[in-house]
Amino acid sequence: MKKLILLTVVALMSVLLLAACGSGASKEVATTGESKEGNAEQGVSGILDTIKQRDKIVFGVKHDTKLFGLKDPATGEVAGFDIDIARQIAKEILGDENKAEFVEVTSKTRIPLLNKGDIDAIVATMTITEERKKEVDFSNVYFEAGQSLLVKKGSPVQSIEDLTKDTPVLAVKGSTSTINIRNAAPDAPVLEFENYAEAFTALKAGQGVALTTDNAILLGMASEDNSFELVGGTFTDEPYGIAVKKGNTELVDAINGVLDTLKSNGEYDAIYKKWFDLQ
């Protein structure tokens, strides 16, 4: 009888011990899960502190877009309107414009690189759209553009209405331009390229009758080769914004503050005139 009671007590203690261990393990997993979630939130909200501790801010910029971001093959330096705006953001946040670091992006790669954490912000002729707002957060508008057409001088194509099934149009992958041109000229074949340099080379080679993107970008191409011209005015509004990772309101607020400062102190106008006063 005593032996039976002893066995029963031992069995009961074993059950209680296992239950306690299971409860502790569950609690540890739950705590770990909460910790990971908290770290994820901190990773977004604490980005400004991270940038200051790192003492540099990494921007995704174009390397192939004259007037906005164009790399000089001889020096390796990137220059343009977007580059100067990015430098001013670094100057206001970190006290030195040279603390801006630049990583090449294209229309296709910029959001993936941002979401991977390879860059802190995108300053790369990026149009603010409702669809993109689902993936990233935008600053206030820092440049107003509109989509247009670039053609060889003397081309019969002088406006969007002249595009037909026999007039191939060139555009860049991942840009809003490809969507807009298909909506505006549904009969015209659209050939897509990886970047603007490839698209412009294809236009020069006669692979299409027109190249379409934002007028400010096309203006840079026309200034590079005066045998091409912009025609037909604009057929869309393309407001550019600086993009950051979704939920990163702290960095958006800081960038908006810098843009406000640049516009109030005249620095924005000086940068604009530097790149677009081409007369």
List the model feature ranges, each with a label.
Residues 6, 17-32:
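Bacterial lipoprotein signal-peptidase II cleavage site
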Residues 22, 33-37, 41, 83-84, ...:
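Extended ligand-binding regions for polar small-molecule ligands
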Residues 32-46, 52-121:
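Extracytoplasmic small-molecule ligand-binding "clamshell" domains
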Residues 87, 99-161:
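Acidic, polar ligand-binding/catalytic clefts
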Residues 100-112, 156, 173, 191-201, ...:
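Short helix-initiation/N-cap motifs at beta->coil->alpha
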